Amino acid sequence: MRMDMYHTKILKAIESEDYISVRRRVLRQLVESLIYEGIITPARIEKEEQILFLIQGLDEDNKSVTYECYGRERITFGRISIDSLIVRVQDGKQEIQSVAQFLEEVFRVVNVEQTKLDSFIHELEQTIFKDTIAQYERCNKLKYTQKSYDELENHLIDGHPYHPSYKARIGFQYRDNFRYGYEFMRPIKLIWIAAHKKNATVGYENEVIYDKILKSEVGERKLEAYKERIHSMGCDPKQYLFIPVHPWQWENFIISNYAEDIQDKGIIYLGESADDYCAQQSMRTLRNVTNPKRPYVKVSLNILNTSTLRTLKPYSVASAPAISNWLSNVVSQDSYLRDESRVILLKEFSSVMYDTNKKATYGSLGCIWRESVHHYLGEQEDAVPFNGLYAKEKDGTPIIDAWLNKYGIENWLRLLIQKAIIPVIHLVVEHGIALESHGQNMILVHKEGLPVRIALKDFHEGLEFYRPFLKEMNKCPDFTKMHKTYANGKMNDFFEMDRIECLQEMVLDALFLFNVGELAFVLADKYEWKEESFWMIVVEEIENHFRKYPHLKDRFESIQLYTPTFYAEQLTKRRLYIDVESLVHEVPNPLYRARQLNIQKSVATGGNYANC
């Protein structure tokens, strides 16, 4: 058999040291999350500033086996950090070589459904395989800080810093991974199809904008050619909508699962896009390589990545433009968000979907157009994905190292909080709208590394509100008019929550625990900047901001950002258990501790911080 280029690269990657490094990382994140989420309860032996964790298991002969590792419980949300290799102890000690063996042995002691365990093991093994290839191919010709925003979207290859199956991409074969994985920067052509209006719809009240985006994205000449093709099939172009499709989705899912629709001309293949596109970190969002200022295109992908199926739910596609319009109006009427912080909303301004109400194809054919960040960048401004702020070069150097050295850690950190974090909190406190502001949903706009402002994105599934806490309830969209799923849904299913605590949990979980907290780790581990000091500065800047808005005092207190503990999502547990009452666990809040320390510091110096 003749080996192709991809096959040769894969063999070299697996034989390299990168395979061992990636396997160690996946196992480390796996053990950290299992302990942190309380899925396993190892014995703990305190040893100076470290903890020796002893994890019990049973081998296939039901003989006792122990896994050992050293780590710490962090100030930042009580997160667990494993600092040593993880070794298997049974007739001697040996570093773990197999994710499958570790989980099989540990879960003979802890009960879990075998099919769920097998599925999770597969995700982890695929993550090791696919990240090994990415790390082996990693390009270090330029430092990260020398790269543009678009380049960073492709070069930030490390994936989720907490989730252990951060690069599973279940559905992609190895050639698919090379062709469509964002790390490999292969340009692709979108597939355009015509979809009959009996099953195809545009976003709610979005027809005019949809027509405009088609002319812009396809071009009038090509649009006419597409209409002629529909005519030649004996159909009326006025009865069809045009939808861009990811080429992998077309080849591997649409053709086989929509064969009946293709046969009866419910779907008509039109051709490839003129422009080239390239995947961003989220995989299903594509940037226009030919014309970078043109919109990003978010399309359905029937792959499982970071434990989530990357399709687009029809109801969320339907409401996407309305949500962006709502948020845009809110920001435009808030002088702080509009003029002072100059927050950028990358609006999801148009959308289209095809839905036959069949379970097997649900969410598999849809598109959302989102504004490009390049549309907003001013002179001398550049941008970096927020998760890039806690990423590292291959040698372990933080990519923000040069910026910290140039501006000083405290000065740079305070600016970051003022320009990027405070606007998200202000939106919750002033307006009652919480965004899922994790690392991929935020973009820092900077000038030579100095934080300037924040761009926020991906609103169609990442927003929550508690109706009694909305500043202007009458401005909130009526989602029940937009899609039948909303009309048939209940509280907490979508955007509307039944308690104000949900807004608090969204901010503490998405913004701080799994996003800003990672930056606290980088500063602590690489620069010996204490986590306590980090969170004290965060609290100082939050309170400095809200002192300027005394009318928000009661609303700020209602959010209870300084609660001693809160309930965080269990990302790993949800891969192992389905029939459980709750997939959250109680964790300590570093903002509470930091505020207490700030009060003590103020009292000691004769201040009145506690009365602020």
Curated annotation (Swiss-Prot):
GO terms for molecular function: acid-amino acid ligase activity; ATP binding. Gene3D superfamilies: 1.10.510.40, 3.30.310.280, 6.10.250.3370. Pfam families: FhuF, IucA_IucC. The keyword Cell membrane does not apply. GO terms for biological process: siderophore biosynthetic process. It catalyses: N(8)-citryl-spermidine + spermidine + ATP = N(8),N'(8)-citryl-bis(spermidine) + AMP + diphosphate + H(+); N(1)-(3,4-dihydroxybenzoyl)-N(8)-citryl-spermidine + spermidine + ATP = N(1)-(3,4-dihydroxybenzoyl)-N(8),N'(8)-citryl-bis(spermidine) + AMP + diphosphate + H(+). Changing E461A: Increases relative acceptance of spermine, norspermidine and 1-aminoethyl-1,3-propanediamine. Its EC number is 6.3.2.-. It is an enzyme of class 6 (ligase). Keywords: ATP-binding, Ligase, Nucleotide-binding. Disruption phenotype: The deletion mutant cannot produce petrobactin on iron-depleted medium. In vitro analysis show that mutants grow to a very limited extent as vegetative cells in iron-depleted medium but are not able to outgrow from spores under the same culture conditions. The keyword Nucleotide-binding applies. Pathway: Siderophore biosynthesis; petrobactin biosynthesis. Involved in the biosynthesis of petrobactin, a catecholate siderophore that functions in both iron acquisition and virulence. Catalyzes the ATP-dependent condensation of spermidine with N(8)-citryl-spermidine or N(1)-(3,4-dihydroxbenzoyl)-N(8)-citryl-spermidine, two intermediates in petrobactin biosynthesis pathway. PANTHER family: L-2,3-DIAMINOPROPANOATE--CITRATE LIGASE, STAPHYLOFERRIN B SYNTHASE. Homodimer. This is Citryl-spermidine/3,4-dihydroxybenzoyl-citryl-spermidine:spermidine ligase. It comes from Bacillus anthracis. The lineage of its organism: Bacteria, Bacillati, Bacillota, Bacilli, Bacillales.
